């Protein structure tokens, strides 16, 4: 009986400890990542986060927030409802370079026909980043999607440009990081919760 009680006590301690650990923000490269957030009042959970590197430089930490966690790209891409990619800059990058990298990621993961169908949204994305000027170290760029609004670019709490309509466009953006040809394989693994 004493053995059973001590096992139950240990199990209780483990459950409480793991619950407390889940409630704490995660941290990557000094960037605190909340376990939950909201877009358009809809609750989202942190699916995963990772580091984007270019050559030997640490460029940004990206975090993916979704309605329901998943570990494979296809499931994440098929989810509907509000979602967020939160990017915290680790170095200064001019907006043209940042937008160019996003455009390259779109081209790498979509056919010419698919890109042609997304041209108005891609143009709006480029215009939004043109308003940003330079993304500075510590800036937080959120790509927020809500079905009734579309995709918004929010930099340090301020929307830039106009919203880009369509669930398909947000999924296209996600493919930059979790598609078949991701911008960074390690980042993809992190966003998938790996």
Residue ranges of model-derived segments:
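N-terminal secretory signal peptides
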Residues: 24-79
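N-terminal signal peptide c-region/cleavage motif recognized by signal peptidases
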Residues: 18-21
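Short aromatic-centered micro-motifs
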Residues: 37, 152-154
């Amino acid at each position: 009986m004493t053995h059973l009680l001590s096992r139950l006590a240990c199990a209780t301690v483990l459950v409480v400890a793991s619950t407390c650990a889940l409630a704490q923000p995660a941290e990557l490269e000094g960037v605190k990542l909340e376990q939950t957030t909201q877009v358009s009042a809809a609750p989202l959970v942190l699916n995963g986060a990772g580091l984007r590197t270019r050559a030997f430089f640490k460029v940004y930490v990206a975090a993916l927030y979704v309605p329901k966690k998943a570990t494979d790209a296809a499931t994440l891409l098929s989810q509907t409802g509000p979602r967020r990619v939160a990017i915290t800059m680790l170095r200064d990058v001019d907006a043209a370079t940042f937008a160019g990298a996003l455009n390259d990621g779109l081209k790498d993961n979509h056919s010419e026909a698919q890109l042609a169908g997304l041209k108005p949204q891609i143009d709006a994305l480029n215009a939004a980043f043109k308003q940003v000027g330079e993304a500075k170290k510590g800036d937080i760029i959120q790509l927020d999607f809500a079905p009734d609004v579309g995709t918004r670019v929010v930099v340090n709490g301020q929307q830039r440009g106009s919203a880009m309509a369509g669930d398909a466009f947000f999924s296209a953006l996600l493919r930059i990081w979790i598609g078949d040809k991701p911008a960074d394989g390690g980042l993809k693994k992190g966003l998938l919760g790996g």
